[in-house]
Amino acid sequence: MSSEPSASGKCVLYTTKGELQIELWAKECPKTVRSFLQSIQDGKWDGIVLGKVAEDAVWAPAGLCACSAEINGRLRFNRRGLVGMAPGQDQPFFTLASRGELDGRAVVFGTLVGQSVYRLMEIAQGEVGDDGKTFVYPAEVRRAEVTIPYFDGLSGQKRRAEPEQQAAPRPRKIATRVRLEYEESEDEASDPPLDVRIRAAHDILQDERLTDALHGDSPPPRPAEAPRGSDSAPCVASPDRRAEAAPPTDGPPSRCASLAGPAPASPGPVTDLAPQLSAREQGTLSSLAEFRCKRGGKNPLLG
């Protein structure tokens, strides 16, 4: 179980490499802690650099505060991250390892807490010059703040540091609206505007002109002519062909007449049918009658 007493004061150093939060044993080392806090209140830490590393410690500049010989057996240099100062030197330092040889010779009055120990180690790993002690790019303390003063009546006491002011919102850029105007040429201005209208399909189908064209009277179809040689055509010979094909009255009857048999009774004179047929049809019928007689009374179409 640790024998270290509880801390009673607190302060923060804001460096370029992060925050260093320090808890202070103000009850055990009142004079040293009061001098340390007073130096912060006076602004002595603002702008200083932690520019030296030596003897497993990072050193601050001398002359910032005074140290009294307040040795306490419960406070020892047994780890890294402790804040100490030697009487008569008045130069604070931060340990990087255990420094037991300083017990009884220097005063331990504070300790780093939280992530501050890792910030200290990062500072200690900075590049050093030829002497091996001085940092080439030291960490700078931008400002210091007392968060728990413990003591009353510290002169020039600062208020608790206000949070970093938020960056002012950038003004919103309003885009300029550009209106483009095109001048019309004389030819375009003289041309009358075109009235183009798009009609729907159902409007076109209801157009009377279109329906008249679709449903108008069309000429009657021409009747198909009966094929030549069809049985439907009447086999009627012209009067001239009948006279030629008729057998002579004198003498024995011809073979054609005997095969054809007696001529049927004519319903009337042939001349009555002739005017109803064209000359071409009459010629066709005469040819068929003659061919029938030559075939011996057989139907020329049926063979």
Swiss-Prot record:
It catalyses: [protein]-peptidylproline (omega=180) = [protein]-peptidylproline (omega=0). GO terms for cellular component: catalytic step 2 spliceosome; cytoplasm. SUPFAM superfamilies: Cyclophilin-like (SSF50891). It holds the Pfam family Pro_isomerase. The keyword Protein biosynthesis does not apply. GO terms for molecular function: peptidyl-prolyl cis-trans isomerase activity. One of its GO terms (biological process) is mRNA processing. Keywords: Cytoplasm, Isomerase, mRNA processing, mRNA splicing, Nucleus, Rotamase, Spliceosome. InterPro entries: Cyclophilin-like_dom_sf, Cyclophilin-type_PPIase_dom, Cyclophilin_A-like. Residues 7-153 form the PPIase cyclophilin-type domain. Residues 155-195, 208-274 are annotated as: Disordered. It is found in: Cytoplasm; Nucleus. Its EC number is 5.2.1.8. It comes from the Eukaryota. PPIases accelerate the folding of proteins. It catalyzes the cis-trans isomerization of proline imidic peptide bonds in oligopeptides. Involved in pre-mRNA splicing. Belongs to the cyclophilin-type PPIase family. CWC27 subfamily. Associated with the spliceosome. This is Peptidyl-prolyl isomerase CWC27. The lineage of its organism: Eukaryota, Fungi, Dikarya, Ascomycota, Saccharomycotina. The gene is CWC27.
